[in-house]
Amino acid sequence: MSKSKCSVGPMSSVVAPAKESNAVGPREVELILVKEQNGVQLTNSTLINPPQTPVEAQERETWSKKIDFLLSVIGFAVDLANVWRFPYLCYKNGGGAFLVPYLLFMVIAGMPLFYMELALGQFNREGAAGVWKICPVLKGVGFTVILISFYVGFFYNVIIAWALHYFFSSFTMDLPWIHCNNTWNSPNCSDAHASNSSDGLGLNDTFGTTPAAEYFERGVLHLHQSRGIDDLGPPRWQLTACLVLVIVLLYFSLWKGVKTSGKVVWITATMPYVVLTALLLRGVTLPGAMDGIRAYLSVDFYRLCEASVWIDAATQVCFSLGVGFGVLIAFSSYNKFTNNCYRDAIITTSINSLTSFSSGFVVFSFLGYMAQKHNVPIRDVATDGPGLIFIIYPEAIATLPLSSAWAAVFFLMLLTLGIDSAMGGMESVITGLVDEFQLLHRHRELFTLGIVLATFLLSLFCVTNGGIYVFTLLDHFAAGTSILFGVLIEAIGVAWFYGVQQFSDDIKQMTGQRPNLYWRLCWKLVSPCFLLYVVVVSIVTFRPPHYGAYIFPDWANALGWIIATSSMAMVPIYATYKFCSLPGSFREKLAYAITPEKDHQLVDRGEVRQFTLRHWLLL
């Protein structure tokens, strides 16, 4: 169906909102009617087939300022993993050589997918489920990413609660993780201990004899009071109180929509950069810092011959940008229709990558200092995950002058890094469901309260004595293969079923420029192939989770797979439901299922472009 010419039968009328001429004012609606013998015809090539009714379009709130949107996207994408995962992967996989596959995958897959989600949400002006009016049969992928974001909230908020606990603990003359004379310490605690094991440094029994490790595992988590995931014990009141504060902060950041969250990110998205700069300036002055930075940047191009390096780069690109959680779709749905989403995608992905790379200097300057302090190689103190930011880094900070102040600043940075990412995940769930169910839309504040309370109640399992085992299980299964699967189906749905040509036309209507051949090739071929590769690799290389020396029982692994498959199952379940609920023959059902809702009148006339070879070959 041509966008410049839409014929309708006698006694029909067409109402189409014209392209916005003023981004600030309400959308003007223009009707250009040409009387013909056969009825009424719309003849303006700039008119838009609206993604929703004009009333819905007018009621859609928008960001107060463009910078609110950019800070929200940056705050969501730049999270704790930028600090604790990328620098370690870079060091482990050949230093500077790791940047080759990382930047390659970022350019051919990461940026195109990021751009695709921003454009998808902005054009359709709905959340992760509602945008699938472009291909109704795949609406289940919207519920997949919403459910994944909901699952992630169960354990991600706990990391923020840990950081808040450490933040409060920093307001003491002597930091509680520098001595072995506390009530939680074991007889094996030794101030002078240095680990010679890099396997899970800080999270195993060997390194667990340092004061910093014992404070995290015994003083905060009370892990010594649990025998495993089948012996959780009661929630710890200190962590529960911190979790309550996190939930309260999240609720009042989200209850009024982007009008409130857009103001919160002015602090949460910018403060980490101030603190990282201060830590870098302090870190490079420490003895051994240059050794750590040299280890971080050392180039070993022979490592590029190893498949594991490319796998690590591919998975890091997928997870670091935050595609597939529905957050980018939700955020961009509140943009003005004519916003330049292409420029936004380039800016935010570039900032994300630069932040990951620069944080490595901060991390490894302190790791070099710790290696010299303990007289061990860098590899014996280099680690990723919670062990880095809750054991290694606090121990290093504790040796500095004004250690309490540095500790408070560091954990305040972790709080802000976590809060805006958690806000993004919650907004994905709220926007996705509120846009789908009008009853929830009328009671958004109450629904937001219900969502944050639900995540709080389920997060309580993670703040028990054995809560770290629940945390590890959720971290391993909730957003692993399932999120990659969701992004793969999303990419196929947009580029193949909806069509790259149609998608490019949509972007041209918004920005005035059609994406060039490079982006269309990436959407059509490169990104789906890349995602298929990553999904297959994640399944083939799957290893059951473990925490230090603790091996999870079979029933726990089975529960983990139930969590993972429950979100992925939304795709076939909804597709089956949609197909069976449509009227007509098998061919008519299929036509309605894969044709955008706005083009269903064409299906009535037997014009189904998805049934033509040309549709599948066009770029």
From Swiss-Prot:
Q: What's the impact of mutating residue 404 to A? A: No effect on dopamine transport activity
Cell compartment(s), UniProt: Cell membrane; Cell projection, Neuron projection; Cell projection, Axon
Biological process terms in GO annotation: adenohypophysis development; amino acid transport; cognition; dopamine biosynthetic process; dopamine catabolic process; dopamine transport; dopamine uptake; hyaloid vascular plexus regression
Q: Which GO terms describe its molecular function?
A: amine binding; dopamine binding; dopamine:sodium symporter activity; heterocyclic compound binding; metal ion binding; monoamine transmembrane transporter activity; neurotransmitter transmembrane transporter activity; norepinephrine:sodium symporter activity
Cross-referenced InterPro entries, in alphabetical order?
Answer: Na/ntran_symport, Na/ntran_symport_dopamine, SNS_sf
Sites where the protein binds chloride = 316, 320, 356
Q: Which residues bind Na(+) 2?
A: 77, 79, 82, 320, 352
Main location class: membrane
Q: Which residues lie on this side of the membrane: Cytoplasmic?
A: 1-56, 499-515, 583-619
Q: Which cysteines are joined by disulfide bonds?
A: 180-189
Residue numbers binding Na(+) 1? 75, 78-79, 417, 420-421
| Residues the record lists as binding dopamine | 79, 149, 153, 319, 421-422
The ranges of region (Interaction with TGFB1I1) come to 560-589
Membrane topology reported for the UniProt record: Multi-pass membrane protein
Into which family does the record put it?
Answer: Belongs to the sodium:neurotransmitter symporter (SNF) (TC 2.A.22) family. SLC6A3 subfamily.
Q: Which additional comment does the entry carry?
A: This protein is the target of psychomotor stimulants such as amphetamines or cocaine.
Classification via NCBIfam families: Na_transp
Protein name per UniProt: Sodium-dependent dopamine transporter
Q: Which organism is it from?
A: Rattus norvegicus
